[in-house]
Amino acid sequence: KLPPWSDEPPPEMKLNSRNVYSVLVNAQNQLLVRGEQMQIHDLKHNTKIFIANPEKRSDMSENPQKAIISIKNDRGTKYNTYLEVYNELKAAYNELWEESAMAKFGKNLDQLTAKQTKEIKDAIPLVISEAEPTKFGEEK
């Protein structure tokens, strides 16, 4: 059932920028992650550190449940590059889930019960936000 109609604008959601891991892919297939250039092969490792924040740094996510991965590409980005970036981000979550399953239950994720798997994924929810592509790199 839908909520009743309202002419009031929706409440503004405030996101703490420390919890947002922004990944931009430009038309030259280069990455800008949280304002810094990064190579694709470093993305998974750095994403894991951001989500888990083992050192409790103030410039990383408060905790895995608040971490948001935001990916935005340019219309000129090669599809294979976009897929490679997305797969690295997803792989970061997969590794965190595996590590958590082993630490908590002493088993691989695929050996857990449905309830145990849910517990792991609730503690480290997969949140990848995909923004509309930009047109900056299009040729005129």
Locate predicted features.
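Long, low-hydrophobicity, acidic/polar, solvent-exposed interaction domains
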Residues: 1-140
